Amino acid sequence: MSEIREARLQKANSLVSKGFASYAESFSVSHTTKFLIQKFDYLENGQEEDFSVSLAGRVMAKRVMGKIAFFTISDQEGQIQLYLDKRMINCNLENQKLLSFEDIKEIVDIGDWIGVYGTIKKTNKGELSIKVEKWEMLSKSLQPLPDKWHGLTDIEKRYRQRYLDLIVNPHSKNVFKTRAKCISFIRQWLDNRNFLEIETPILQSEAGGAEARPFITHHNTLDIPLYLRIATELHLKRMVVGGFEKVYELGRIFRNEGISTKHNPEFTSVEIYQAFSNYVDMMNLTEELIKDIVFNVCGSLVINYQNKEIDFSKPWSRISMKDIVKKYTGIDFDSFSGDFQSAKQAVKSINVEFSNKVNSMGRLLNEVFEQKVESELIEPTFVIDYPVEISPLARPHLDNKEMVQRFELFIVGRELANAFSELIDPVDQRERMQLQQSLRDEGDHEAHCIDEDFLNALEIGMPPTGGLGIGIDRLIMLITNSPSIRDVIPFPLLKPEITSNKNEKLPLNEVK
């Protein structure tokens, strides 16, 4: 590696010695590869078009055959071939200060960024090309690309050095284009329905809105602990109290929890709140939004995910947690009539393991669902009516205070959305937060804190409201057929690589 780097560095220096920059300040690009390929697709083999272009890109392939050379360069939109003829490039050297054909042959390596000026032609073999008249070095690459056309096969290195992954794996680049398109579409969809995007604090004095362990930092001037937000819920609800009836925020959430193919400590979600609505309204909104996203991005409501066909056009199932647990396990929680010991024995008989934290019928029901049912829900399924113990911010059912008006959406065995009719009764909310605080005081780091300002806001008065949260990363996984959340986050959190000396980090390019 050091020999290759040294040779390339010498080439960069030779450019400077000739009076040219090896790292340009700018370059005027007239068109993209995508535009040129679409516009001139009609050309016949061997036909030329006197259409002037200037194009910049990274060199991905290089073939020199005497006085002719063929390069392939890549820009954000795709790839195109360069046709370089020694006579054409060298004909103006006496009148202008230009780089020669010999220069491009000797100095340019795969991985370099170059800019070219020329016209359009289609080769005799049918390859649309730019017939280069002159060229410039834009940025000299000092390190070679991995495996050229074969891609970056080391999965962990793909995540650590995403820039290399994007260069050599076209699929990865398409994933992040799709991600950007989805996020843009969601914002447009909500804006068109008169939702207002709100920016809530990332640094908060209280971490609330979800059962999750927060990241803690410290503000030096104020000398107080602060928390990275674990949800945007409580601040968005404050906006509803203030009179904004339809609000949302699409942004980053931080939870100090485990890492898996489904979890990253830093992730993206959209939370949506709509006054005068309940969880049924939010179910309808969720189904409409996700169907529109899938169709807009994929062009169809039927997609394939990891060899499973998902049909979004069919009516989405809506079933209570109790009923779906009974369906998949045979256990009817209503039959226990509150007898927790009998329920535990029945649950143990189907090999469900649980900790002492599972100390109520509702938590036990949820444990059975997560271990025995969740992974079976392949087609879009709304699981509704959750236990109150695990839903401290949701409105209870009038006819059954032990259950709340909440749903979660599951697709391919993963939770994709979570929503409920919001709890707007300040007295009930205080009682639930006090219970959560007592659990926290006993060592449950994921339990909610009491947020006095939020409770005060509820006492001012909050209208009936439906709230919804959608995990953007999991949605992108589904749409792009990606098996891991790390595939759809540009820079996922990874444990730093270190040498045997734990205090000495290796440069990434020298990590074996």
Swiss-Prot record:
EC main group: ligase
Catalysed reaction, written as an equation: tRNA(Lys) + L-lysine + ATP = L-lysyl-tRNA(Lys) + AMP + diphosphate
Which residues are noted in the entry as Mg(2+) 2-binding? Answer: E415
Q: What does the cofactor section's free text say about binding?
A: Binds 3 Mg(2+) ions per subunit.
Q: Quick one: a GO cellular component term? A: cytosol
Principal location:
cytoplasm
Keywords, A to Z, come to: Aminoacyl-tRNA synthetase, ATP-binding, Cytoplasm, Ligase, Magnesium, Metal-binding, Nucleotide-binding, Protein biosynthesis
Q: Where does Mg(2+) 1 bind?
A: E408, E415
What are the BP-aspect GO terms?
lysyl-tRNA aminoacylation
Spell out the molecular function terms from Gene Ontology: ATP binding; lysine-tRNA ligase activity; magnesium ion binding; tRNA binding
Q: Which Pfam families match?
A: tRNA-synt_2 (PF00152), tRNA_anti-codon (PF01336)
Which cofactors does this protein require? Answer: Mg(2+)
Query: What CDD domains does UniProt report for this protein, alphabetically?
Result: LysRS_core (cd00775), LysRS_N (cd04322)
* Subcellular location(s) of the protein: Cytoplasm
InterPro entries on file? Aa-tRNA-synt_II, aa-tRNA-synth_II, aa-tRNA-synth_II/BPL/LPL, Lys-tRNA-ligase_II, Lys-tRNA-ligase_II_bac/euk, Lys-tRNA-ligase_II_N, Lys-tRNA-synth_II_C, NA-bd_OB-fold
Tell me which EC number(s) this protein carries. 6.1.1.6
User: Is the Signal keyword given for this protein?
Assistant: no
Whether Protein biosynthesis counts among this entry's keywords is: yes
* Subunit relationships: Homodimer.
Q: Which NCBIfam families match?
A: lysS_bact, PRK00484.1
Q: HAMAP family per the record?
A: Lys_tRNA_synth_class2
Similarity-based family: Belongs to the class-II aminoacyl-tRNA synthetase family.
Name recorded for this polypeptide: Lysine--tRNA ligase
Please report the organism this UniProt entry assigns to the protein. Answer: Prochlorococcus marinus (strain MIT 9312)
Q: What is the lineage of its organism?
A: Bacteria, Bacillati, Cyanobacteriota, Cyanophyceae, Synechococcales
